[in-house]
Amino acid sequence: MWPPSHRQLCLAFLLVCVLSVISFFLHIHQDSFPHGLGLSILCPDRGLVTPPVAIFCLPGTAMGPNASSSCPQHPASLSGTWTVYPNGRFGNQMGQYATLLALAQLNGRRAFILPAMHAALAPVFRITLPVLAPEADSRTPWRELQLHDWMSEEYADLRDPFLKLSGFPCSWTFFHHLREQIRREFTLHDHLREEAQSVLGQLRLGRTGDRPRTFVGVHVRRGDYLQVMPQRWKGVVGDSAYLRQAMDWFRARHEAPVFVVTSNGMEWCKENIDTSQGDVTFAGDGQEATPWKDFALLTQCNHTIMTIGTFGFWAAYLAGGDTVYLANFTLPDSEFLKIFKPEAAFLPEWVGINADLSSLWTLAKP
């Protein structure tokens, strides 16, 4: 047994060593970030922790199924802070989220979303990326980078520690190598999935009254595209002839399918889609203010028919199965083809049916 004085000296020496080590590491962390950028993370369900950026976790930012807290942590090997502008509608923001997640992982950076994106996606999906506090957003020395809509070599070697992405990326070339992770991020909340499955479970084939064996989700994009495509992009939207061809493709390959139609132009669909075979149901509500209702229906189907747009892309990507899409829907000289590469937009195994461009060719004649 040491004498009391000797033990006290040893304890004091150990305490000084511990405090010195802690001070050294705190100094390193503080010097790694701009002056004034806080090191605290404010989470409603745990005490103070210290990653190198100030964020807060909004209620409902869930972690994985085995996690005990709703405030996600990034792996220690990641650094920096990346985020993305939440521009556009529902499908656009899904593309931005998936692209941010994939590029941040590829470059070894931490990814955060802004509150507006959380507000758009968290009520629908079990997303896990944490939310960047407005005060941290405003005090971070961002470099901004506008992405084009396909993966490029330079995106695999981005050195910026504080990067804010922008644009409307929605290409599988960014994130398809993480498909299972993306599907987990975009897992529907239980009540939305159960509600959609309940609707599908009540459907019957019109001619026989039997339960369908195969559900084919159909998304018909109309709305503002009716003006934007022909007037700005020299393009068309899906017409009744395309939808008939797409449905016939599935009828030839699947026994007793039912086509579950959703659209932001349901009246047009009811007037122009052939229902004579008793296998078409207009199940969507067409409300753009609550897109997740139609989206949930589409993702619970076995296969997909899409026209154009990111909403249809994501429904098809998450549903899996076969996908038929509208191909070559612009004239060859369309400016749209400078920002959109079909080979990067549609998975190679998806089936394209060419659009009817006759109305555009007529207008293009001198």
UniProtKB/Swiss-Prot annotation:
Q: Which GO terms describe its molecular function?
A: alpha-(1,2)-fucosyltransferase activity; galactoside 2-alpha-L-fucosyltransferase activity
Keywords in alphabetical order: Glycoprotein, Glycosyltransferase, Golgi apparatus, Lipid metabolism, Membrane, Signal-anchor, Transferase, Transmembrane, Transmembrane helix
Lineage summary: Eukaryota, Metazoa, Chordata, Craniata, Vertebrata
Instruction: Note the SS bond partners.
Output: none
- Pathway linked to the protein: Protein modification; protein glycosylation
Hey, what's the signal peptide range on this chain? none
According to UniProt, the reaction catalysed is: a beta-D-galactosyl-(1->4)-N-acetyl-beta-D-glucosaminyl derivative + GDP-beta-L-fucose = an alpha-L-Fuc-(1->2)-beta-D-Gal-(1->4)-beta-D-GlcNAc derivative + GDP + H(+); a ganglioside GA1 + GDP-beta-L-fucose = a ganglioside Fuc-GA1 + GDP + H(+); a beta-D-Gal-(1->3)-beta-D-GlcNAc-(1->3)-beta-D-Gal-(1->4)-beta-D-Glc-(1<->1')-Cer(d18:1(4E)) + GDP-beta-L-fucose = alpha-L-fucosyl-(1->2)- beta-D-galactosyl-(1->3)-N-acetyl-beta-D-glucosaminyl-(1->3)-beta-D-galactosyl-(1->4)-beta-D-glucosyl-(1<->1')-N-acylsphing-4-enine + GDP + H(+); a neolactoside nLc4Cer(d18:1(4E)) + GDP-beta-L-fucose = a neolactoside IV(2)-alpha-Fuc-nLc4Cer(d18:1(4E)) + GDP + H(+)
Biological function: Catalyzes the transfer of L-fucose, from a guanosine diphosphate-beta-L-fucose, to the terminal galactose residue of glycoconjugates through an alpha(1,2) linkage leading to H antigen synthesis that is an intermediate substrate in the synthesis of ABO blood group antigens. H antigen is essential for maturation of the glomerular layer of the main olfactory bulb, in cell migration and early cell-cell contacts during tumor associated angiogenesis. Preferentially fucosylates soluble lactose and to a lesser extent fucosylates glycolipids gangliosides GA1 and GM1a.
Q: Which InterPro entries does this chain map to?
A: Glyco_trans_11
Location relative to the cell: Golgi apparatus, Golgi stack membrane
Lumenal compartment segments:
26-366
Can you tell me which residues are glycosylated? 66, 302, 328
Q: Which family does it belong to?
A: Belongs to the glycosyltransferase 11 family.
Q: What is the topology of this protein in the membrane according to its UniProt annotation?
A: Single-pass type II membrane protein
- Provide a GO biological process annotation: regulation of cell adhesion
- For whether the record's keyword set contains Membrane, the answer is yes
**PANTHER family cross-referenced by the UniProt entry:** GALACTOSIDE 2-L-FUCOSYLTRANSFERASE, GALACTOSIDE ALPHA-(1,2)-FUCOSYLTRANSFERASE 1
Give the EC class as a word: transferase
Regions crossing the membrane: 9-25
- What is the designated name of this protein? Galactoside alpha-(1,2)-fucosyltransferase 1
Provide GO CC annotations from the record. Golgi cisterna membrane
